[in-house]
Design a protein with these regions (language model features):
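Short acidic-hydrophobic, aromatic-tinged amphipathic segments that line or gate anion-handling sites
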Residues: 1-2
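Pocket-lining segment of extracytoplasmic ligand-binding domains
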Residues: 5-9, 13-99
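Short loop/turn and capping residues at structural boundaries
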Residues: 21, 41, 105, 151-152
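Flexible, active-site-adjacent loop/turn segments at secondary-structure boundaries
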Residues: 27, 54, 58-59, 123-125, ...
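Short secondary-structure boundary/hinge segments and terminal tails
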Residues: 28, 47-48, 111-112, 157-159
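Secondary-structure end/capping motifs
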Residues: 62-143
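Conserved C-terminal helix/tail region of periplasmic/extracytoplasmic solute-binding proteins
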Residues: 133-162
Length: 162
């Protein structure tokens, strides 16, 4: 079910529970319903979902490693700036949005996004742990979303963050 249909089903109380992206859907739905919802974070139950990711083709990464590193450094700087001043980050984002977002919702979206970086202590923003990948892949395989689990280096690398 697509997210708009799922949201309609939830807001009309045809379903009682739905999964959402905390960084964008949750603030929008609460604003739309004018209700504060109870949130069950899967991380509270031991599953650290992989958050925002940058996907780069292997060939491009191999041919342009410095470009990938620059993109990751710029992205990390954006996250650090947003962490330091979420309201300023939301105002900057608002300038570039084709479809304007309610300022209050956008503030909450930025706040939720910066909380979801889940980089381990001492590691750069964007760093991902092998154990988190393994847990996510195992869940996908067990629930039928993935036919087989390949070696972890087929899915991600932290090499360009170093």
């Amino acid at each position: 079910m697509d997210s708009s249909a799922r949201t309609t089903q939830f807001l009309t109380r045809k379903i009682d529970v739905m999964s959402v992206y905390l960084s964008n859907e949750w603030p929008q739905i609460e604003k739309r319903a004018n209700v504060k919802f109870n949130i069950l974070r899967v991380s509270d139950f031991g599953l650290n979902l992989l958050g925002a990711s940058i996907i780069v083709g292997n060939a491009f990464a191999e041919q342009s490693p410095e470009t990938v590193r620059k993109l990751l450094r710029a992205t990390a700087k954006g996250y650090r700036d947003a962490i330091a001043d979420p309201k300023a980050a939301a105002k900057t984002m608002a300038k570039y949005m084709r479809v304007p977002e309610d300022p209050e919702v956008l503030d909450r979206q930025v706040e939720a996004t910066v909380l979801s970086t889940n980089a381990p202590p001492g590691k750069p923003i964007g760093w991902q742990e092998a154990a988190d990948w393994q847990a996510n892949l195992t869940l996908l395989k067990e629930t039928g979303g993935l036919p087989e689990i390949k070696p972890l280096n087929a899915y991600y690398t932290n090499d360009y963050l170093q």
